[in-house]
Amino acid sequence: MLHRYLPMTEEDKQEMLKTIGVASIDDLFADIPEQVRFRGELKVKPAKSEPELWKELAALAEKNASVKQYVSFLGAGVYDHYIPAVVDHVLSRSEFYTAYTPYQPEISQGELQAIFEFQTMVCELTGMDVANSSMYDGGTALAEAVLLSAAHTKRKKVLISTAVHPQYREVVRTYAKGQKLEVKEIPYDGGITDLKALEAEMGDDVACVVVQYPNFFGQIEPLKAIAPLAHEKKSLFVVASNPLALGVLTPPGAFGADIVVGDMQPFGIPTQFGGPHCGYFAVKAPLMRKIPGRLVGQTTDEDGRRGFVLTLQAREQHIRRDKATSNICSNQALNALAASVALSALGKRGVKEMAAMNIQKAHYAKVELEKRGLSSPFAGPFFNEFVIRLGRPVSDVNDRLLEKGIIGGYDLGADYPELAGHMLVAVTELRTKEEIDRFVNELGDGHA
């Protein structure tokens, strides 16, 4: 352009037309018949000033039920958690905000170290040996775990509990279809995976057993009992886990999990319409070379200084193309950084306290709802979500709650016909006693 800081000028247009040998812009469209060419002005609104545009967009945004204006008891994979103020401050730094895959370590040490710290934190939470730099979200991380299991065992059958998040299971089925894998769903009993049904399906053709911890109903799966069933047949044991729950629960790695995946949304990532999120993927050492996605390793340079580099890159698509272990590329480095900053701000003690608050407040809510005559079909231990039985359609109850400034729980009947009229309630550390009591009063006030 002739003028560096000005948009397209008439001089620019004439210079471009002259360069390509065309007299006018109309000549560029000469191959379009005259009778079908548009003439006149497009019916679009005139341009707005910046203040006018802000007002219009704000009015549109106010039509949404935001957790900033409403009290949310909705979870089902996306939760309203505390985000330390420092998270947005660090994310807004230009070297992180616009960074891409750090192929050149000599100019990317900051980003590489941030990713390395993320990997380290994931390993500490899950009790695993190696974690990658992130996945797109929990669902795609689980699907990649299934593909890894099939490739490693050279088997085609996948056993997955119906107590795993319905959308996670749908993503797994989508990935499995292209690989011609058989996905067999194991029913739940009492809110957790039916161990007898699982044992009956186990065979030498099973690539992996997949459960969620805590599961979709918030219940704590008995990993200690499930792992031997998988390993007895030399199948891999895959666990999808809420990382916040691992602040108080025994990590899956301690029970013998081969692959642990999940979604880092509880740490530093807002609800934001359900995405983008940040999946995590961790494995035991024998599977290290088959893990999908980027891996950052720590090394020393020729002067003995500590440095960070992308390692084991022969697994990746920019090296091996069609032979790569995964086609995930840019991953979710910025959201992984958000999770890392949030975890760093909280510290180990803070994560434990945050998880404990979720447990305490969720159990308080359940006890109070039971006092009002509501009941749960499941009696096992749970984390920060639980199921309650309503006497009316959940959609009707949620519409009424919304009028009262409350976002109600998830309608389980949408995915589990046998649980029609049941609500999945999530209670996080942000919910106050007054908010929980108001929710209980609204549900107990003729909604049960």
Curated annotation (Swiss-Prot):
Gene3D superfamilies xrefs: Aspartate Aminotransferase, domain 1, Type I PLP-dependent aspartate aminotransferase-like (Major domain)
Pfam family, one: GDC-P
InterPro entries given in the database record: GcvPA (IPR023010), GDC-P_N (IPR049315), GDC_P (IPR020581), PyrdxlP-dep_Trfase (IPR015424), PyrdxlP-dep_Trfase_major (IPR015421), PyrdxlP-dep_Trfase_small (IPR015422)
Any single GO BP term: nucleoside metabolic process
Keywords: Oxidoreductase
Domain of life where this protein originates: Bacteria
Entry EC number(s): 1.4.4.2
Catalytic activity, reaction form: N(6)-[(R)-lipoyl]-L-lysyl-[glycine-cleavage complex H protein] + glycine + H(+) = N(6)-[(R)-S(8)-aminomethyldihydrolipoyl]-L-lysyl-[glycine-cleavage complex H protein] + CO2
GO molecular function: glycine dehydrogenase (decarboxylating) activity
Summary of subunit composition and partner proteins: The glycine cleavage system is composed of four proteins: P, T, L and H. In this organism, the P 'protein' is a heterodimer of two subunits.
General function of this protein: The glycine cleavage system catalyzes the degradation of glycine. The P protein binds the alpha-amino group of glycine through its pyridoxal phosphate cofactor; CO(2) is released and the remaining methylamine moiety is then transferred to the lipoamide cofactor of the H protein.
Family to which the UniProt record says this protein belongs: Belongs to the GcvP family. N-terminal subunit subfamily.
Name of the protein in its database record: Probable glycine dehydrogenase (decarboxylating) subunit 1
Taxonomic path: Bacteria, Bacillati, Bacillota, Bacilli, Bacillales
Gene transcribed to yield this protein: gcvPA
